[in-house]
Amino acid sequence: PVLQGLRDVPVPVSVDTIKPEVMRAALAEGASMINDINALCAPGTLAVVAATDAAVCLMHMQGTPGTMQQYPGYGDVVAEVKAFLLERVRAARDAGIASERIAVDPGFGFGKTLEHNLELLRHLRDFDALGVPVLAGWSRKSSLGKITGRPAADRLAASIAAALIAAQNGARILRVHDVAATSDALSVLAAVEKKR
């Protein structure tokens, strides 16, 4: 019923799911994007998205939601996340999903330590090599709490700072809670960068 009610809203609707049956139902009800924390690895998910004109965001996660933060470890977090996402972008293209419909998300906070998250943010531009837009979601993340010592409700300034850094480092899509404040900050950044 919620998706039906949003059909007349003039903005894209993204549905977060890893299940092909939920994807199918959501897309049939008018969702225009699937956000999959498993990067369309589950059987049937590639085919469901490929059969539509919907966009998809492929996210990296080490482990599962229940285990991802127990012992995250990488030899080279940037190289490993990039290699995984490259493989998933290729799989999506091979399934018939056009590059114009694909975005990638390094999965900040999903099976990563604070230092892993910061290293990915520092090297976000490396993901431009994948040839699809990069999505960054730092808004109110626990990593920001570790840096600032503030609870989630008090992380607006930190969230905006992370969003601006992500944008400067190549992110073309930002997942945020505080849309107006982040938009204002991005407008200032754009005005400054226009004069460079």
Where do the protein language model's features map onto the residues?
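Active-site metal-binding loops of divalent metal-dependent hydrolases
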Residues: 108
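Active-site-adjacent loop and "lid" segments of alpha/beta metabolic enzymes
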Residues: 1-12, 17-23, 27-28, 32-91, ...
